[in-house]
Swiss-Prot record:
InterPro entries: Ribosomal_uL29, Ribosomal_uL29_euk, Ribosomal_uL29_sf. The keyword Nucleotidyltransferase does not apply. Keywords: Ribonucleoprotein, Ribosomal protein. Gene3D superfamilies: 1.10.287.310, 6.10.250.3450. The keyword Kinase does not apply. GO terms for cellular component: cytosolic large ribosomal subunit. Pfam families: Ribosomal_L29. Belongs to the universal ribosomal protein uL29 family. The gene is RPL35. This is Large ribosomal subunit protein uL29. GO terms for molecular function: mRNA binding; structural constituent of ribosome. It comes from Tetrahymena thermophila (strain SB210).
């Protein structure tokens, strides 16, 4: 394994390749932890943090790819899973829609139609 994993290179790999590499990293991490208990060298102990970060990067890319696949699956559909929907504030989610804002009661419509706005003229 490289000393550090570059994320832009991971994005070009397929999910199967990523999962395979992830398995190798996880076995390496378990071996390093065993070496730590057995009293391993300092460079092995320092490598634990690097491997953990590499595992996190692989998992992040795998999850991004899976989420993107689900987004593509639900693209253009009216109902989407909650975690795929656009994140908005609670207040914005509860705001009235344009149709609801423009809705007028029948009684109000009749008033407006039958009794137009009054025009007032001021005497000079």
């Amino acid at each position: 394994m490289d000393k550090s994993v570059r994320v832009f290179k991971l994005r070009t790999q397929t999910e199967e390749q990523l999962v395979g590499e992830l398995g190798k990293l996880q076995t390496e991490l378990s071996q390093l932890r065993i070496a730590k208990i057995a009293g391993g060298t300092a460079n092995k102990l320092g490598r634990i943090g690097i491997v953990r970060k590499a595992i996190a990067k692989y998992l992040t890319i795998i999850n991004e790819k899976r989420r993107q696949a689900v987004k593509d699956q639900f693209k253009g559909k009216s109902l989407k899973p909650l975690d795929i929907r656009v994140k908005k504030t609670r207040a914005i989610r509860r705001k009235l829609t344009k149709k609801q804002r423009e809705a007028v009661l029948v009684k109000t419509q009749k008033k407006l139609n039958n009794f137009g706005l009054r025009k007032f003229a001021l005497k000079a």
